[in-house]
Amino acid sequence: MLDLEQEMSRCRVCPRKCGADREHGKTGYCKAPSGVTAARAALHFWEEPCISGTTGSGTVFFSGCNLRCVYCQNHHIAEMESGKVISIGQLSDIFLELQAQNANNINLVTPSHYVLQIREALLLAKEKGLTVPIVYNCGGYESVEALQALDGLIDIYLTDFKYMVTSLAKAYSRAEDYPETAKRALAEMVRQTGRAVFDENGLMKKGVIVRHLLLPGAVKNAKAVVKYVYDTYGDTVWLSLMSQYTPLPQVENISPLNRKTTKREYERLLDYTFSLGVTNAFLQEGPVAEESFIPEFDGRGI
């Protein structure tokens, strides 16, 4: 199993395995220090209905990212422009406070580069009475070894599967190995949680949701993702097909990322999805590409 002290001195937690000495102030691709850095902890109502429910998901947004996609919708925290360093004890207390606010679950957003610290915080919080499900909300670019360090602690994996087209993974996320890496990670997630389980109120208690944000001009890539996931896992996992891509200023000169996804592009993806026989899927309706989906990373709850 990965060791926190060793990994922080030569970080190999994520698939980039860049070897940064985070313990002594050096940072790698994710830009994260050794101390957990978070930008917001609050109830969040914009996840899938089975995650947010009516009382909200207790969401912790971590700063830094091992992908840092050029079109990132949360680029302020991905680039470490906001966030506060907190201790493992403080993080465990944040989990308990969110539970006290009647959160349906604890939702860890972009947690990959803090896996080992999060493991310690979860163990501590569970000793103090944390009982709600734990959601690991990630970009899909995960090390199997890091995921195994969380085995038994994570109830729900809410993972992106961004690319099956290698050229897009390289151009947009500088991760040419994304497709194969995401396949291995997803297999480990499904191994840990098994088939999705819901309670009487429709809230997910255990399982995997695979998200795909349809990018402009990338219907072929999206279809390939859906086909792979459904061919491999069938109804064991749920798909979440999103059309809310919002072109932000950093991509104003990058075509086709400088436009919204069209209604027709999304309809083509849905038609294909239904033609495969997919039934376990969350879809979006109406005009949803708005910056209102992007929360304020103002340090609330940290």
Identify what each model region corresponds to:
Residues 86, 113, 173-181, 217, ...:
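Alpha-helix N-cap and loop-to-helix initiation/capping positions
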Residues 58, 106, 134-136, 157-159, ...:
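Hydrophobic faces of well-ordered beta-strands that scaffold small-molecule active sites
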Residues 78, 115, 140-143, 161-179, ...:
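Conserved radical SAM core fold
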Residues 170-201:
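Anionic-ligand binding region
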Residues 30-156, 165-166:
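Conserved Radical SAM active-site core
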Residues 91, 118, 182, 186, ...:
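Aromatic/hydrophobic pocket-lining residues that form the small-molecule binding cavity
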Residues 122-133, 184-189, 263-269:
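Alpha-helix-loop-beta-strand connector modules within alpha/beta enzyme cores
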Residues 1-27, 194-302:
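Auxiliary Fe-S-binding modules of radical SAM enzymes
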